[in-house]
Regions:
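Short edge beta-strand segments in beta-sheet-rich domains
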Residues: 118-120
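Histidine-centered, metal-coordinating catalytic motifs and their short helical/loop contexts
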Residues: 94
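Contiguous ligand/interfacial binding patches
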Residues: 122-125
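Signature for HUH/AEP ssDNA processing cores
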Residues: 1-91, 101-105, 114-116, 128, ...
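Short beta-alpha junctions and helix-cap segments that line functional grooves
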Residues: 108-110
Length: 168
């Protein structure tokens, strides 16, 4: 991407603080942060997991059951209680809660997968207002703010129990 386009992307983020600082922090997960900025101009950037953060992949069915809702507002309300960033991927019917690195070493909840070192995740640019394709369901409030694994595990457990009860 040329410098003028990159500058335009940064200007759009500056209008939504602390989005630019969060974008810089996320981009620093990559060996070449400039390539992340280039990718964001086109769509989500592919970032390595395990350095700055891991991601817990949760099915949409599990999240919707935990929220006891399928409406945008009901699901967002539940996910915002994780107090950290959550990406929605409607193409794959999944959510990704960003959690501290090395969560993979202690994650014991079998109903959602924790992705870490060696895995990559499509991450949209912060403050992007779209619901087409991967997008932030809950924005990162400040650089380095992550969901607590215990809170995510509780959400997954509630969703799993509700799905199991509904199937019986």
């Amino acid at each position: 991407m040329n410098a003028q386009l990159r500058a335009a992307l940064r200007v759009s983020l500056v209008a939504k603080p602390p989005a630019e600082a969060c974008a810089d922090w996320l981009a620093s997960a990559h060996d070449r942060p400039i390539t992340v900025w280039d990718a964001w101009y086109e769509g989500p950037a592919i970032l390595p997991l395990g350095r700055l953060f891991d991601a817990i992949r949760i099915t949409a069915d599990t999240v919707h059951a935990a929220a006891d809702a399928t409406t945008h507002g009901g699901v967002t309300d539940l996910l915002s209680r994780l107090h950290g960033p959550v990406i929605s991927d409607p193409w794959r019917n999944r959510y990704y809660a960003l959690v501290p690195p090395q969560t993979t070493e202690t994650w014991r909840t079998g109903y959602a997968q924790c992705l870490g070192r060696g895995a990559w995740l499509g991450v949209p640019v912060p403050a992007l207002d779209t619901q087409h394709g991967p997008h932030w369901r809950v924005q990162m409030p400040w650089p380095g703010a992550l969901c607590q694994p215990r809170d995510v595990a509780d959400l997954v457990q509630v969703g799993h129990l509700r799905l199991t009860a509904a199937a019986q």
